[in-house]
Amino acid sequence: IGQVNDYSYKDDPDKAVDSRYLHRGEFNWSLAPNRNIADTVQGKLFHALDHLEHIRSSHSVFDTTADLRTIDTWDSSILAIVRENAEEKFIGIYNFSDQDKVAWINEDDGIYTDLISGHEMEAKGVMIPAFGCFWLCRKK
């Protein structure tokens, strides 16, 4: 469902040095029913995550047996991860910057489909929006 960061962990001496507690605050159960209302923050997050889960379960390239590697994007704020098996090749491109960027990759093996949006594109010099991601995939 998602919730905002909880900085109260800093007030507990046993937790203050461990920033993982930022995401482990008390869950606000009163917001949980909102996941079924499409135009709420909780509904948008719930349905977006459900969509990603469906994508992952529909493609064998997400199996644990797939080969995994990174490719250089020539920008430290952009991460590109390749997953590959005999049937598919997947490139996940993630922009951790607050600015639109170009992932300077040069995969010249065909047209990919962004599994999230359905748009087709080449995996070359990919323009990626601020804090955006693409899940590019192609059949072999």
Region roles according to the model:
Residues 52, 91-95, 112, 131, ...:
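Hydrophobic, well-ordered secondary-structure elements that form the walls
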Residues 122-140:
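C-terminal beta-strand-rich structural cap/linker in extracellular carbohydrate-active enzymes
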Residues 4, 81, 119, 129-131:
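Compositionally biased, intrinsically disordered low-complexity segments
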Residues 30, 105-108, 129, 137:
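A structural detector for beta-sheet-dominated domains
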Residues 1-90, 96-104:
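Loop/helix patches that line or flank the sugar-binding groove of alpha-linked glycan CAZymes
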Residues 33, 85, 97, 109, ...:
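A broadly conserved detector of short glycine/acidic/proline-rich loop/turn motifs that flank catalytic sites
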